[in-house]
Structure formats: structure tokens, C-alpha cells
Amino acid sequence: MDIQAVALLILTSTCVQADRICVGYLSTNSSEKVNTLLENDVPVTSSVDLVETSHTGTYCSLDGISPVHLGDCSFEGWIVGNPACASNMGIREWSYLIEDPSAPHGLCYPGELDNNGELRHLFSGIRSFSRTELIAPTSWGAVNDGVSSACQDRGASSFYRNLVWFVERGKQYPVIRGTYNNTTGRDVLVMWGIHHPVSTDEARKLYVNNDPYTLVSTSSWSRKYNLEIGIRPGYNGQKSWMKIYWYLMHPGESISFESNGGLLAPRYGYIIEEYGKGRIFQSRIRIAKCNTKCQTSVGGINTNKTFQNIERNALGDCPKYIKSGQLKLATGLRNVPAISNRGLFGAIAGFIEGGWPGLINGWYGFQHQNEQGVGMAADKESTQKAIDQITTKINNIIEKMNGNYDSIRGEFNQVEQRINMLADRIDDAVTDVWSYNAKLLVLLENDKTLDMHDANVRNLHDQVRRALKTNAIDEGNGCFELLHKCNDSCMETIRNGTYNHTEYEEESKLKRQEIEGIKLKSDDNVYKALSIYSCIASSIVMVGLILAFIMWTCNSGNCRFNICI
């Protein structure tokens, strides 16, 4: 037993004095958690939330270009030229338009703007225009300009600024004709309209002729309008009806008008100076002195995140809209806290026993123990490769989620309810697909990231094992017990891959033989002791069995002792 104690003491002394190097990874006090396909709430050293949830709460300039608020005017009132919207007539450029959903000044005369939703959508793609006179009112002939008390201008009857309502002059209304040739080299928006009286008496009073008509023609189409007599729900003291039409003329096109009653002739139109992505936002939030690269109807979004869940109808350089409120992408390692008491007398330990809280400037690294003390150093090369891989992952997610789908829901008003419903359903379906794809993609990437970190640590471990060859004992926990003395310079060669195992091969061979010899002697003594104990135990058992047999036979009368003197 004394030999065993001596052997154990020698072995313990050898273990304490041996130089060691361990491979490990960073651990922190981070509370970050991510989800993967197989696990939820996996602790990680760091992560990034890919979904933006905050906004400015205001309208901002978009990339330095200010928006235009239409004030008390609706889009229809502004574009047709309601006299109450005169202050907006000078608008030329905007990043986007803002319309108060309850603006009081729309079409001042009862009626409607044909294909209103399509025109709104067109203006969502216009960034600037200029207002220009198309046909002078005096060029049409012997007719008068009509006005209405429904369209007040500073207390007097007036009419739309961009149209001319022709009525009889001297109880005559001859056939009038007018033509506009688009020689601007740009697209031009032209508007005209038809007045539909409440009765034939009103029609004769205004236009004299029986069955008035209007003919509008271009080189590619022609349309004839007749008056639709009848009383309609009205407002502003009027019950007749005006329907306003529009056409976007391309360079070189001409448009001609012929009428003998009921025509609202074009006076001013709009030359489209610049197309671009825009929106007509409808909300009551205020305009602020701020700049953003992404604008929604609830506020600006300034972020570099991949996704946002603020609003689907966004304008500018915007993150993709998804329904998820949070998508966390792992950017660090699986966070395994260090074991507080580990190793012999608190010695260093490898990655199997947890992470290292003291690792600086790296995710993976080395910890060593020798006569000069204990040291720790990060492996910057493997860390940088991992960082590059994660950066690539984020960029790939952005690229994969970039699509050409744009919502058109915000461009339609209440007239096009069925279009709105269809747009909503399409938007919901597309958003569901984007949201599912985004979540699945992040879960997959989290799995890959954590697996990548595990692989990187094991690759580093294998790299050290291949370098040390037979000069060390792999302890199986991420550490190697060196069979030779290794100062700090020697440790550095192991870390940077310049270690020369042949230089220490002879010393290591002798050390290995010494350790194996001590273990063999210790094992022999143990075997001898076990043999003695086994022999004694077997003898005692045999004696006990014999005595028990004798006592049983005596009690049953089968055995008799005769004592002779």
C-alpha cells in the first residue's frame, strides 16, 4: 500500500508540473438567445435583431427632397384646379405627396374624376412636373366661359383653373373645335370633362342645341360623349354632374376636341419633367425638419436592418416588410458559461468544459500553463474568417429577400373598393410568404452559424493535435498535456503553426516512458493486492460452507461424532 501512495504522489506531482495548452472559445455574461430549426432560446454570446420596429412618427424629407402637403385640398381638387387650392398651383417637385384623408376641398362641382385610382398611381411615379397652357380659351370661337357658385374664389363664382366650361353666347352655341400637339418632347397630362345637366330645359338653356355631343380623338382612339340628363345626389347647391377625364400624351401625339355643348375644355395641363418612385400618403402626422431614407404614413425609418414591421406601404430605400416583430440572427457563439471549479487545483481546461470569459479580441483561442505562469491568446485568423462568414450571411439574407413586388394599396381611394380588396388580399398573401421565408432563412442560418463555430473550434483543436503529434497527450477535453518543457515562445509556435515537433521529440519520448512506467508499477501493486484479497475471501467462504454443511447433517441425524477415551 505504501508503494501505491508513492506512485500516486509521483503521478500527481507529474500532472501538476506538466506544461499544458488548451483550445477554447469565448463565453460572456450575455443574455442573448436565438432560435434555430431544432432548438428555441439557445444562449449565444451575441446576436443582432434583423427587424426594425421604431420610426420617427413624422413626415421627413426623403434623401434631401422635401415632401408636399396638399393642405386642405384632396388630390382630385389639386390636380383639376379647385379655386380653393390656388396656393398649390405652383407645386413642381416633391419626394412624395401628403393628402389629408378628410381634406374639405375636393371637386367643388358635383362629379367624379374618371380612373381616379390609376391617376393616383401614375402620380406615385412622378417626382416633378410643370404646369403649362394647352389651348387658349379665346381660340375656341363664339362661346362664353361658364362659372358656378359651387366653385367660389374669394366670394365670387368661379370654376376649375385647369378647365374651361363653355356655354352659349347670344343664344348660340356653334360647333367648336380645338387641337393640342405635344411638341414638348415629354409626356403631357391632358384633362377635359363633360357636364351632364339635370334636365333638357337646363341643357337647352346652356347649350341651345338639341342632342349636344362632344368628340375627343387621337391617332389611336376616338370617343363620343352624349349628355346624360338626370338629377343626381349633389352638393354645394348643385344637382347636375361633371365627369372629368384625363389622358397621358406621349411626345409627338395630338389630341382633338369637337363639341356643340357640354364640353369642359382643357386649358392647363402638366408636362411630366421627371419620373421616379413616389407615394401619396394619407395620414394626419406632422411634417418635421428631418431626413430619412425610408418613409411610411406613420413615420420615417432610418435603419440598416434587413426587415421592418412598421408598415407595408413604405417608400424609399426600405427594409423588407414582414409580420414578425423579432428575428434574431446569431452573430456569436453558443454561450456556454465557464465551470467555476474545474481541473486539478483549478487548472486550465478546454472547450469541452465550457467557454472562457477572459478571451479578448477573438472568438476562439488558446490558454496555456507552464513554469512562467498561465496565459491566454485569441486566434485572430479563425475569428476573422468567422466574422467574414457571418457578414456574408447577413448580406445574403438581404439579397435573397430583395424582391420587385411593390404594394399599390395606398394609391386607391374609396371608389375602387373591389380593387382595394384584391390589393389587400394580394399584399397579405405576399407578406405572409415573405415573413415565412425570412423566418425560415434566419432559423437555417442560426443553425449553420452555431455549427460553424463548433467546427471552427474542433478544427483548431485538430490543428494543434497534428502539430504536436506524439509530443503531447490529448486529454479529451480540448487540452493537451505536453511531454516536454514549453516556455512562452514555444507556446507561441504552437499557436501560430510554426511548432517543430522533432525538436522536442526525444524529450517527449523519455517523458512518455516515465509516465507509462509509473502507471504500470501502480497497476501491478493493485493487481497483487486484489489477488490476496480474493484468495482470503474465497477461503473464508469455503470454510463457512463446510461448517454449515456439517451442522445441517448433525441436526438431521445423518452425522454422528464418536468420542473414544
From Swiss-Prot:
Q: Which GO terms describe its cellular component?
A: host cell plasma membrane; membrane; viral envelope; virion membrane
Residue ranges annotated as coiled coil are none
The known PTMs are summarized as: Palmitoylated.
One matching Pfam family: Hemagglutinin
**Cross-referenced Gene3D superfamilies:** 3.90.20.10, 3.90.209.20
The membrane spanning regions, by residue number, are 532-552
- List the ranges whose topology is Extracellular: 19-531
- Give the superkingdom in one word: Viruses
Localisation? Virion membrane; Host apical cell membrane
Q: Which UniProt keywords apply?
A: Clathrin- and caveolin-independent endocytosis of virus by host, Clathrin-mediated endocytosis of virus by host, Disulfide bond, Fusion of virus membrane with host endosomal membrane, Fusion of virus membrane with host membrane, Glycoprotein, Hemagglutinin, Host cell membrane, Host membrane, Host-virus interaction, Lipoprotein, Membrane, Palmitate, Signal, Transmembrane, Transmembrane helix, Viral attachment to host cell, Viral envelope protein, Viral penetration into host cytoplasm, Virion, Virus endocytosis by host, Virus entry into host cell
- Which terms does the record give in the GO molecular function aspect? host cell surface receptor binding
Lipid-carrying residues in chain (S-palmitoyl cysteine)? 554, 564
- Keyword rRNA processing listed? The answer is no
One GO term of the biological process aspect: fusion of virus membrane with host plasma membrane
Miscellaneous notes:
Major glycoprotein, comprises over 80% of the envelope proteins present in virus particle. The extent of infection into host organism is determined by HA. Influenza viruses bud from the apical surface of polarized epithelial cells (e.g. bronchial epithelial cells) into lumen of lungs and are therefore usually pneumotropic. The reason is that HA is cleaved by tryptase clara which is restricted to lungs. However, HAs of H5 and H7 pantropic avian viruses subtypes can be cleaved by furin and subtilisin-type enzymes, allowing the virus to grow in other organs than lungs.
Q: How does it assemble?
A: Homotrimer of disulfide-linked HA1-HA2.
What is this protein called in UniProt?
Answer: Hemagglutinin
Q: Which organism is it from?
A: Influenza A virus (strain A/Gull/Astrakhan/227/1984 H13N6)
